[in-house]
């Protein structure tokens, strides 16, 4: 079944995460990394975690979001190398989108953690 709302690479969304005890939810930001064509044909969407807990020095794979306010975030935040899928219909809302500079950083982060796919052949 196709979905009507489609997100672009770099869109910042809010997802409901359950509390560790299983009662209640936390609303957390994440960034879309799946292609629109993937989303048109699937019920899920592929996301990468965003956190406002910034510890220096950053861990391997973490990247500071330079234009966090333009992305719709409330605080300075980082991209974390935690990839997950989420049911599209459960997304709460879109906050904004990463700037082109931050999208380039996201692209580099993905290459750092996933490697160069062309080199896999």
Residue ranges: model-predicted function:
Residues 23-27, 32-67:
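Compact nucleic-acid interaction/catalytic patches
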């Amino acid at each position: 079944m196709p979905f009507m709302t489609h997100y672009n690479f770099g869109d910042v969304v809010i997802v409901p995460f359950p509390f560790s005890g299983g009662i209640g939810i936390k609303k957390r930001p994440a960034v879309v990394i799946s292609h629109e064509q993937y989303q048109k044909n699937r019920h899920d969407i592929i996301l990468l975690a965003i956190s406002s807990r910034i510890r220096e020095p950053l861990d391997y794979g973490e990247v500071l979001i330079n234009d966090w306010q333009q992305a719709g975030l409330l605080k300075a935040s980082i991209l974390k190398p935690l990839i997950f899928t989420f049911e599209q219909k459960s997304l709460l809302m879109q906050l904004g989108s990463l700037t082109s500079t931050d999208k380039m950083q996201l692209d580099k982060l993905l290459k750092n953690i996933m490697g160069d796919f062309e080199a896999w052949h």
